[in-house]
């Protein structure tokens, strides 16, 4: 025994030493040595090199050929085919799959559009190993035979969302609809999920308890809120505040919140048969290689079935956990609820009467019965006056409740899919919903080359400057977010509230520009017998005309691509509050930065470039071009390193790298810098941190040097136009 102990100790010591050696021999990033260095990694994510599919693979085309009904039938078979390695509660995987789909979509947040069902990110670290996603690794493995069968014709992202719908339908619920179109990612998203370094901790609130920055979940590793209550405090009213804040930051109003919680908790059960600290192993990301991606191995009892331990809460909410009913609401309002503890020690709630002790069937043993349970977050629905009123109205009107849940579920799973033009399949609802940011369908012939040339001439003769036209086109198109495909030039919402009031868009000057463009549009459309042009198209065309003028003045003849076909949205089609989150608190391309920004100016530039799906060279070319065109939001000369503003040249890079200029911070200013002639001491330029980072950051300086070379001016113009066009058509899913 003594020898075995010694041997075990030696082996353990060797393993620890080996692990430490391997860790020490791993390459270290620049951020390891210099944590404050600007990180360009977000602009390199999701490279084509990560994607194993052929470059000519068209997912939309493959999906449209798919027999969706056959896929649904295959999913339906899986639902009631319980597997020994992970037995189904109540003989039905439906509730399990609903949780999987919900948690895949539920990471979405409105403030930056990140998270959500798109990409199938639940397959990757860190999401697949979040505490709130405990045991969902098994749900995806149950679906693997279906994914394997249909291959690339249906993405994991679409399959997960579809499975949630099929699960609901199999349990008697009528869903609102389904759309495919979510292409899979092949690597994890790089997302700021919070400042914490440990799961289930909360360092993300201000002094008033509000979440900071773009965050929506209340703790690291949770999808929404702590079901026990804020920081484990089982106070229903405090929980209601967290629920409203968290779900609200995920685009849900009070009615949708109540419908989702009540509807979701109509099905299935929570799992807390054992104490996690005593029974449950590490999450998938930390599990041994032989586990093959499985995590949370349970060493107590059978490890699954009746011994399953997930959240630590235990029990079902309703008497029929695999059927759609109003029983959740009936139980919530019929009983008085008192606190108790699950077998795992988590605080939950049960009725205060013994008459409820045997209402709920056991998930695996037909001879056992239980009392229904509620989380603190369920009791919050009853205790919060506004939530309660909605829940009571649902209880009185089951049809209203069912439709509300159906619509909220559809919104949850489709919020990050983008405009309806991206929706695929034959189950897309006909109703157009305002949260889909609707734009009228094209209903007229578009302008031809001759019309375009004439309109360009009219625009340039209107008295609008290059700066006016470039800034307006940029303001319109750069509202786009590649995270959830919202915003962009299509719809001309730059002409509507709230975008026409945003400080970054210089509202007074914007109104003057749009007024002149409106007149040009109306004049053309009145005279034209067939072709029409929208304001959305004319704004983009104005930017193209201005850039071509600036290119010509630089001595080149490059043309800016333009594809008509945009339409104009109305104010009625625009949810002002919903669009409010698209407002830029910083836009380094226009040298704009406000105190409301949660990152430094340079970091905000990277974030903006990431939202616009730009690469590092594209971002660099655009910043250099915008400075040459003197396109600062406030009309200032910061970063306009040229003697010929308005001419598209590489002067920004040439003068930034000029060694005859010495830079220093402007006295009494943390946000501005001054560039002086080293010999004369004369002030030559002023700059922001965004301008100077292209000379201080080694990677950005390398690209700046490329564009500053004597033979690179035409290449710079070509690259600027290509990057500009990319931004202008980011939202043109009709031509992609």
Swiss-Prot record:
There is a cross-link at residues 224-250 (Tryptophyl-tyrosyl-methioninium (Tyr-Met) (with W-102)). The lineage of its organism: Bacteria, Pseudomonadati, Pseudomonadota, Gammaproteobacteria, Alteromonadales. This is Catalase-peroxidase. GO terms for biological process: cellular response to hydrogen peroxide; hydrogen peroxide catabolic process. Binds 1 heme b (iron(II)-protoporphyrin IX) group per dimer. Gene3D superfamilies: 1.10.520.10, Peroxidase, domain 2 (1.10.420.10). One of its GO terms (molecular function) is catalase activity. It comes from the Bacteria. The gene is katG. The record marks 99 as: Transition state stabilizer. Keywords: Heme, Hydrogen peroxide, Iron, Metal-binding, Oxidoreductase, Peroxidase, Signal.
């Amino acid at each position: 025994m003594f020898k075995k102990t010694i041997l075990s100790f030696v082996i353990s010591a060797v393993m620890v030493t080996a692990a430490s050696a391997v860790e020490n021999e791993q390459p270290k990033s620049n951020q390891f040595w210099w944590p404050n260095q600007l990180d360009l990694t977000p602009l390199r994510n999701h490279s084509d090199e990560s994607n194993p599919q052929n470059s000519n693979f068209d997912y939309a085309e493959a999906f449209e050929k798919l027999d969706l009904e056959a896929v649904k039938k295959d999913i339906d078979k899986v639902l009631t085919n319980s597997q020994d390695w992970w037995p189904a509660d109540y003989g039905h995987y439906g509730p399990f799959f609903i949780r999987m789909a919900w948690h895949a979509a539920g990471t979405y947040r409105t403030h930056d559009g990140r998270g959500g069902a798109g990409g199938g990110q639940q397959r990757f670290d860190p999401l697949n190993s979040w505490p709130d996603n405990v045991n969902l690794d098994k749900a995806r493995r149950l679906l693997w035979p279906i994914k394997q069968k249909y291959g690339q014709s249906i993405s994991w992202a679409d399959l997960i969302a579809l499975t949630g719908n099929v699960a609901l339908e199999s349990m008697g619920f009528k869903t609102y609809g389904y759309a495919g179109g979510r292409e899979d990612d092949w690597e994890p998203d790089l997302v700021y999920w919070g400042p914490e370094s440990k799961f289930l901790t909360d360092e993300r609130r201000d002094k008033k308890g509000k979440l900071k920055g773009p965050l929506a979940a209340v703790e690291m590793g949770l999808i929404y809120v702590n079901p026990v209550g804020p920081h484990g405090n089982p106070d229903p009213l405090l929980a209601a505040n967290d629920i409203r804040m968290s779900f609200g930051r995920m685009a849900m109003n009070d009615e949708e919140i109540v419908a989702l919680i009540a509807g979701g908790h109509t099905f299935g059960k929570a799992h807390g048969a054992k104490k996690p600290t005593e029974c449950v192993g590490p999450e998938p990301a930390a599990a041994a290689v032989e586990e093959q991606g499985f995590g949370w191995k349970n060493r107590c009892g059978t490890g699954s079935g009746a011994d399953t331990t997930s959240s630590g809460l235990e029990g079902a909410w309703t008497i029929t956990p695999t059927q759609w009913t109003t029983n959740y609401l009936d139980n919530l309002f019929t009983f008085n609820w008192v606190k108790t503890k699950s077998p795992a020690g988590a605080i939950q709630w049960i009725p205060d009467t013994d008459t409820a002790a045997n209402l709920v069937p056991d998930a695996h043993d037909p001879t056992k019965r239980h009392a229904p349970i509620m989380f603190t977050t369920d009791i919050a629905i009853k205790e919060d006056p506004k939530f309660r009123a909605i829940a009571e109205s649902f209880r009185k009107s089951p049809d209203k409740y069912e439709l509300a849940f159906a619509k909220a579920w559809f919104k949850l799973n489709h919020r990050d899919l983008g405009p309806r033009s991206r929706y695929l399949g034959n189950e897309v609802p006909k109703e157009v919903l305002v949260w889909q940011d609707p734009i009228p369908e094209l209903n007229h012939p578009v302008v031809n080359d001759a019309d375009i040339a004439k309109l360009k001439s009219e625009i340039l003769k209107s008295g609008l400057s290059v700066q006016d036209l470039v800034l307006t086109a940029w303001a319109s198109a750069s509202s786009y977010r590649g995270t959830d495909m919202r915003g962009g030039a299509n719809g001309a919402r730059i002409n509507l509230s709230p975008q026409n009031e945003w400080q970054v868009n210089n509202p007074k000057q914007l109104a003057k520009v749009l007024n002149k463009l409106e007149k040009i549009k109306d004049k053309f459309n009145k005279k034209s017998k067939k072709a029409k042009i929208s304001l959305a198209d004319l704004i983009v065309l104005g930017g193209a005309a201005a850039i071509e003028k600036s290119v010509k003045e630089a001595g080149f003849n490059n043309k800016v691509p333009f594809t008509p076909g945009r339409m104009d949205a109305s104010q009625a089609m625009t949810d002002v509050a919903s669009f409010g989150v698209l407002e830029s608190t910083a836009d380094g391309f226009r040298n704009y930065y406000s105190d409301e920004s949660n990152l430094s100016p340079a970091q905000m530039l990277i974030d903006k470039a990431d939202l616009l799906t730009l690469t590092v060279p594209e971002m660099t070319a655009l910043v250099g071009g915008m400075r040459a065109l003197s396109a600062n939001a406030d009309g200032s000369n910061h970063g306009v390193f040229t003697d010929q503003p308005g001419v598209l040249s590489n002067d920004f890079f040439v003068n930034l790298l000029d060694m005859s200029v010495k830079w220093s911070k402007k006295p009494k200013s943390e946000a501005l810098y001054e560039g002086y002639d080293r010999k004369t001491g004369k002030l030559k330029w002023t700059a922001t941190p965004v301008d100077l980072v292209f000379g201080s950051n080694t990677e950005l300086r390398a690209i700046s040097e490329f564009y500053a070379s004597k033979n690179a001016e035409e290449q710079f113009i070509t690259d600027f136009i290509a990057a500009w066009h990319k931004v202008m058509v980011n939202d043109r899913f009709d031509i992609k």
